[in-house]
Amino acid sequence: MSNGHVKFDADESQASASAVTDRQDDVLVISKKDKEVHSSSDEESDDDDAPQEEGLHSGKSEVESQITQREEAIRLEQSQLRSKRRKQNELYAKQKKSVNETEVTDEVIAELPEELLKNIDQKDEGSTQYSSSRHVTFDKLDESDENEEALAKAIKTKKRKTLKNLRKDSVKRGKFRVQLLSTTQDSKTLPPKKESSIIRSKDRWLNRKALNKG
């Protein structure tokens, strides 16, 4: 009896050991499968994240490109504005210079005597006739516009030279400018010099006794 009982216990323990071993093997198999599942899911998640990262990178590059283009457009616009402003300043400076020259010429003309102004007008009339004759010639050559501008500049330059020469013979006294006459003009424009004999005769006549002034 005892020997059979011992044998039964041994068989039972062996069976238990075999069952435990089988369970351990099952656990190992399950754990391996879990690892495989986890690893496969990680790979899938990595594959899913890759397009997102690529999308973010491409979106960032596109935004940076748009910012760069916008900055270039702003720089170009600023450059055009500076160029436009510079041209406007140059035009304004030219106009201001022309106005100042015109004002100076008008002041000089206003300070000159009427006789000299008449001489200038006569010279201008002669220049106008000369320019009209040249204008007809240039019309024949189909260059009227350019030549008219050249003639206008020539007349203006000649007029300035005339005024400049006239200013040499004038002296400014306070707010007025006095024209100095040449020796050839003295006898025509200045009054005659006083004669002492004539003055004495006039005084005697005015102070004669017949008047009885006393």
From Swiss-Prot:
Stretches with biased composition (Acidic residues): 42-52
InterPro entries listed in its UniProt record: UTP16
Modified residues (Phosphoserine): S16, S45, S65, S144
UniProt keyword list: Nucleus, Phosphoprotein, Ribonucleoprotein, Ribosome biogenesis, rRNA processing
Pfam families: U3_snoRNA_assoc
Gene Ontology MF annotations: U3 snoRNA binding
Disulfide bonds: none
Biased composition (Basic and acidic residues): 1-10, 22-41, 54-75, 192-206
Quaternary structure and interacting proteins, as annotated: Part of the small subunit (SSU) processome composed of at least 40 protein subunits and the RNA chaperone small nucleolar RNA (snoRNA) U3. Interacts with snoRNA U3. Interacts with MPP10.
Protein name: U3 small nucleolar RNA-associated protein 16
Organism: Saccharomyces cerevisiae (strain ATCC 204508 / S288c)
Gene behind this protein: BUD21
